[in-house]
Every structure is written in structure tokens, then in C-alpha cells.
């Protein structure tokens, strides 16, 4: 039984949700518009200011799609109202981040600086040289872009150098013991 799928989604004031007969969802809000094709097996009901997702049967596939569909809709509604944000930190001597127009320029100890162009719908802020904020309305795109930045230089376990999420805890290892 999908407990997440059973929870109703409340539609806040100023958000407009449209779902056609093929389960193509369009959510408009103060921050923007999101569109996504949802599973055709699920039945999505909009009554007053509440969205309910109903599954047709109790087989395993429908149970998993039930929770997924509800979560995707909930993320869309939250994205157009509040938006999403990931904070990254650069740890290490000489590790820096700069913003040049729509490019993020990272100096991560390689022989060359790395330039990354911001994807559409994403804003990147660099308040200091060691902090990066990735913001947007689509949770998936924000998370993927933050993961791409982190992938360039993952934190290593000995000194903790690298690009890490702000709330990430790096398990440290003990180095070699000298004679």
C-alpha cells in the first residue's frame, strides 16, 4: 500500500493545475510553469483545491506508480510556489568559483579552469568564492546540475577537499602512520 500516494496535494492560492485525459500535467504558479507527462495508468482527480491520485489496481506496478505520480505532482506544485535550492561548498586551497555572465567558472586544482553554462531555468549564485547556490523551479534539473558540479571534484576522505553539498558529512579516513 502506497502511503505517500494516498496523501492529498493541496493547491496553494495563485497556482493553476491542468491535467488532460492523457495525464499531461501543466502547473502554473508565481515562479513559472512546469509541464510533465505522468503515468497514464493513474487516475488524477482535482476537486476544489485538492489533487488526489487514485490507482486502478493493487498490483505491484500500480502501487509504485501511485506514490511516484503523487510525488511528481507535489514537487511541481512546490516548485512553482517556493522553488528549489541546493547549496554547494568548495573545500580546499585554491578552490574557487566565479560567475561570468551565464557561465560558472570553477578552479578546482586542475591545469585549467572549468566553465559550465547554466541550463535553462536554473540560476546560479556565487555569494563567496567557496559557496555556490543552484536555484530553480524544477527539482530534478536543480539536483542534476548540482550533482554535475559536485562530480567535477568529489570530496576525498583524507583531507575532505573537493566540492560538497552544504549538509553533506564526509567520512574521514586516517592516513598512513609514519615511522
UniProtKB/Swiss-Prot annotation:
Cross-referenced InterPro entries: Ribosomal_uL6-like, Ribosomal_uL6-like_a/b-dom_sf, Ribosomal_uL6_a/b-dom, Ribosomal_uL6_bac-type, Ribosomal_uL6_CS
Alphabetized Pfam families for the sequence: Ribosomal_L6
GO cellular component: cytosolic large ribosomal subunit
A molecular-function term among this protein's GO annotations: structural constituent of ribosome
Keyword Ribosomal protein in record: yes
SUPFAM superfamilies named among the record's database cross-references: Ribosomal protein L6
Gene Ontology terms: biological process: cytoplasmic translation
Keywords, comma-separated and alphabetical: Ribonucleoprotein, Ribosomal protein, RNA-binding, rRNA-binding
Annotated PANTHER family: 60S/50S RIBOSOMAL PROTEIN L6/L9, LARGE RIBOSOMAL SUBUNIT PROTEIN UL6M
Protein family according to the UniProt entry: Belongs to the universal ribosomal protein uL6 family.
Function summary: This protein binds to the 23S rRNA, and is important in its secondary structure. It is located near the subunit interface in the base of the L7/L12 stalk, and near the tRNA binding site of the peptidyltransferase center.
Quaternary structure annotation from Swiss-Prot or TrEMBL: Part of the 50S ribosomal subunit.
Name of the protein: Large ribosomal subunit protein uL6
Annotated organism of origin: Alkaliphilus oremlandii (strain OhILAs)
Amino acid at each position: 500500500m502506497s502511503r505517500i500516494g494516498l496523501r492529498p496535494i493541496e493547491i496553494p492560492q495563485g497556482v493553476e493545475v491542468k491535467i488532460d485525459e492523457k495525464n499531461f500535467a501543466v502547473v502554473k504558479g508565481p515562479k513559472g510553469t512546469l509541464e510533465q507527462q505522468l503515468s497514464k495508468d493513474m487516475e488524477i482527480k482535482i476537486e476544489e483545491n485538492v489533487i488526489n491520485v487514485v490507482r486502478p489496481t493493487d498490483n505491484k506496478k500500480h502501487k509504485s506508480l501511485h506514490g511516484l505520480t503523487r510525488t511528481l505532482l507535489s514537487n511541481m506544485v512546490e516548485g512553482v510556489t517556493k522553488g528549489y535550492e541546493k547549496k554547494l561548498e568548495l573545500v580546499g586551497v585554491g578552490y574557487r568559483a566565479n560567475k561570468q555572465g551565464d557561465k560558472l567558472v570553477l578552479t578546482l586544482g586542475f591545469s585549467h579552469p572549468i566553465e559550465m553554462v547554466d541550463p535553462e531555468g536554473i540560476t546560479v549564485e556565487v555569494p563567496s568564492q567557496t559557496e555556490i547556490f543552484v536555484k530553480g523551479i524544477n527539482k530534478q534539473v536543480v539536483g542534476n546540475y548540482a550533482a554535475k558540479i559536485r562530480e567535477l571534484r568529489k570530496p576525498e576522505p583524507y583531507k575532505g577537499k573537493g566540492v560538497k553539498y552544504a549538509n553533506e558529512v564526509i567520512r574521514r579516513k586516517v592516513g598512513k602512520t609514519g615511522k
